Structure formats: C-alpha cells, structure tokens
Amino acid sequence: MPAYNAAKTLEKTYADIPFDIVDEVILVDDASTDETLQVANGLKIGHIIKHDNNMGYGGNQKTCYTLALQLQADIVVMLHPDYQYNPKLISSMAGLIANDVYKVVIGSRILGKGAMGNGMPVYKYFFNRCLTLFQNILLRQKLSEYHTG
C-alpha cells in the first residue's frame, strides 16, 4: 500500500483485505505528516517502510514493488489505503491472474459507486475523465480509466 497521509482511512482499508488469500502486506509511508505510521504500526502490518523524504507516488510504488519482488510475491496487488478501491475485490481480481485468465487486472474508481462517491476530488475526476476520453480515442479502446493512481 503506497501511503501518504492515510491515517483516517488506513484502518478501514486494512480491515477489508481478504487475508484468506493475502499472505503479506507492505505499507510504504511516503513521509506522511499525519499519524499514518502510528496507525500502520498499531495494525501490525507485516512490512512497513518509511520514506524520510516524500518520493511522490511513483517513488512510493517503486519501493512497494521492490520489496514485493524481494519477498518473491506470486501476485502483487497495489491497493491504495484511501479506500477509493474496494479491498473486498482483491480475491476476484487475483483469481483472474492465478487462473491464467489475465496477466494483469486493473481496478477502476469510475465504475460501481463512482470515484467521487469514494472521495476523489472534483478537479481530479474532471481531468481523469478528459485524459481517459482522449486516450480512448487515440488508442481506439474503451477503458473506464487509464490513470488509476
């Protein structure tokens, strides 16, 4: 979980992870200024890394993936601790990979309850939709969202 100032939503997200199929949880705190690290420690998350300096979303993801590779993970799920993605869907999504249906499965904040209903700011939603429309036209695809982070 790439975390930045996620203290308010981390516990709810973590509680809904399906631990019957999830072996390890990695949380990388990207120099949060709130209580994210304390909440993570209280939850006894297996692997917690703290960045001393904010590395940004990309840097945070790289740290998550590097540790997942070191742990020799079979399937890696990048779950954001802000609950814009429902952790209860991990079993279904990972099953598609484990059963060789797909090599990659990408979640969408746009489908279902909707991104703004899950806390996405209006300006981010607007630009996400514009970029997705442009990319769908350019690439002749029909994805609900290209920018899932």
Q: PLM features: residue spans?
A:
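Acceptor/aglycone-binding surface of glycosyltransferases and processive sugar-polymer synthases
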Residues: H51-N53, Y57-Q70, P87-G149
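Donor nucleotide-sugar binding loop of glycosyltransferases
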Residues: A6-T9, S32, N86
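Short, structured coil segments at secondary-structure junctions
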Residues: I21, L43-I45
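Short beta-strand-to-loop acidic/aromatic patch adjacent to the donor-nucleotide binding site
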Residues: A73-Q84
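Short, well-formed alpha-helical segments that are part of the catalytic scaffolds
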Residues: Y4-F19
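A conserved acidic beta->alpha catalytic loop
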Residues: D29-L37
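A short, conserved beta-strand element in the Rossmann-like catalytic core
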Residues: A31, G56, Q84
